[in-house]
Amino acid sequence: MKAIIKEDVQASLERYADRPVYIHLETTTGSYSAHLNEKNMTVVAYIRNAKVTYHQAKIKGNGPYRVGLKTEEGWIYAEGLTEYTVDEENRLLMAGHLPGGKLAISLQISEKPFTV
């Protein structure tokens, strides 16, 4: 993965617009949060292979970035993204990591279902 270049990510987001895609969205404080301080609560949200069609996509901010995908029924939104890549399967993979390198958020878009 490399640091987000807004124009490149915006172009990638637009390539998937107006057709069915699969979304992976994950955010986590990780179990390490409670492990390091038992008063901290572990917080996780995880969605894999949600099939959606979005009609508008925007990347905003100056880093970390936020991405919004406008669907017919509402929005998919991810904030805290710092890196991205388009892999050999043409999937757009975006992530945000905490200063120590631990994953904080991931938003991935694919034309095919992700492996489970």
UniProtKB/Swiss-Prot annotation:
Pfam family, one: DUF1806
Top-level taxon of origin: Bacteria
Protein name: Uncharacterized protein YojF
Organism name: Bacillus subtilis (strain 168)
Lineage: Bacteria, Bacillati, Bacillota, Bacilli, Bacillales
Gene: yojF
